[in-house]
């Protein structure tokens, strides 16, 4: 590198901060790695991510799988449910996450209305996320009813993560946020999980499912199960990162554990910044050129 290029790089680092160093050797996470981890009894964590900066942090924390969820409808765009969010709204988020976490397996949610009509519609939507979003896999909700869609997508060489139990896109038809798979419904949940595996899914999310049933499904399937409100026997767990880190305020679901208080920290930092600006103490001499 020439002295001029080195000097320019140093100047940019001073202005904007240098890129993070990745001291720990990492491999690119792929679907067969997750399959091997299930075989070895090794659990793994998945988080949602919606931008470059959070994805970078989660990769540094050792999270192997990141989901650009349609939950962006709630935490990014402020919709009340996941139903309104579109492919065009999700694609830029996927691209940012892929760039921020080059070693993670990045899964993109197919939003409501983008796959239900036919296998052809599902494949077209999944292809957009792979070509335009650079995602590594897609996720869609439903069991037996979407098995043809899963089969069509996987036949085209696109990995699919399935999602059974409570499916947020169907919140209106399910009568609200309710635990699924209780009583007589347990048999259908098991059938749904088997159907998505047979259709070619590489893993399946189980949301708001009784822990006992989720454990039975996990033992029955050869693909990894990912729990969210489905007990500890699943092969992996997933949470929305804003819930996990305490970024969101107000009441959270029973299955959420807050591992931090990011919201309080950010609020305090913003308030301190505003106070110093009003007082004329920021920027100080050391922050000026």
Curated annotation (Swiss-Prot):
Its main location: cytoplasm. 3-methyl-2-oxobutanoate binds at residues 70-71, 109, 139. SUPFAM superfamilies: Phosphoenolpyruvate/pyruvate domain. GO terms for molecular function: 3-methyl-2-oxobutanoate hydroxymethyltransferase activity; magnesium ion binding. Pfam families: Pantoate_transf. Signal peptide: none annotated. Residues 1-33 are annotated as: Disordered. Pathway: Cofactor biosynthesis; (R)-pantothenate biosynthesis; (R)-pantoate from 3-methyl-2-oxobutanoate: step 1/2. Residues 1-10 have a biased composition (Low complexity). CDD domains: KPHMT-like. It catalyses: 3-methyl-2-oxobutanoate + (6R)-5,10-methylene-5,6,7,8-tetrahydrofolate + H2O = 2-dehydropantoate + (6S)-5,6,7,8-tetrahydrofolate. It is found in: Cytoplasm. The active site is at 207 (proton acceptor). Mg(2+) binds at residues 70, 109, 141. It is an enzyme of class 2 (transferase). Catalyzes the reversible reaction in which hydroxymethyl group from 5,10-methylenetetrahydrofolate is transferred onto alpha-ketoisovalerate to form ketopantoate. PANTHER family: 3-METHYL-2-OXOBUTANOATE HYDROXYMETHYLTRANSFERASE. Belongs to the PanB family. This is 3-methyl-2-oxobutanoate hydroxymethyltransferase. It comes from Rhodococcus jostii (strain RHA1).
């Amino acid at each position: 590198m020439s002295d001029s290029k080195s000097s320019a790089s140093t100047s940019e680092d001073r202005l904007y901060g240098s890129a993070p160093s990745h001291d720990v050797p990492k491999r690119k996470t792929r679907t067969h790695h997750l399959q091997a981890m299930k075989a070895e009894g090794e659990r793994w964590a998945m988080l949602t991510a919606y931008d470059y900066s959070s994805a970078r942090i989660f990769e540094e924390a050792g999270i192997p799988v990141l989901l650009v969820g349609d939950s962006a409808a709630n935490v990014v765009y402020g919709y009340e449910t996941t139903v309104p969010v579109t492919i065009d709204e999700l694609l830029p988020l996927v691209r940012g996450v892929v760039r921020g976490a080059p070693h993670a397996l990045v899964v993109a949610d197919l939003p409501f209305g983008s796959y239900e009509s036919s296998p052809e519609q599902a494949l077209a939507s999944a292809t957009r996320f792979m070509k335009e979003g650079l995602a590594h896999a897609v996720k869609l909700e439903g069991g037996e009813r979407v098995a043809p869609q899963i089969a069509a997508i996987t036949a085209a060489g696109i990995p699919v993560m399935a999602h059974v139990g409570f499916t947020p896109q169907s919140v209106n038809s399910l009568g609200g946020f309710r635990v699924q798979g209780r009583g007589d419904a347990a048999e259908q949940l098991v059938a749904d999980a088997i159907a998505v595996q047979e259709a070619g899914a590489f893993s399946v999310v189980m949301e708001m499912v009784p822990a006992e049933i989720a454990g039975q499904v996990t033992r029955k399937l050869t693909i990894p199960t990912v729990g969210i409100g489905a007990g500890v026997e699943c092969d992996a767990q997933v949470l929305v990162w804003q819930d996990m880190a305490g970024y969101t305020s107000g009441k959270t679901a029973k299955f959420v554990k807050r591992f931090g208080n990011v919201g309080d920290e950010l609020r305090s930092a913003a308030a301190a910044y505003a106070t110093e600006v009003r007082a004329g103490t920021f920027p100080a001499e050391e922050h000026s050129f």
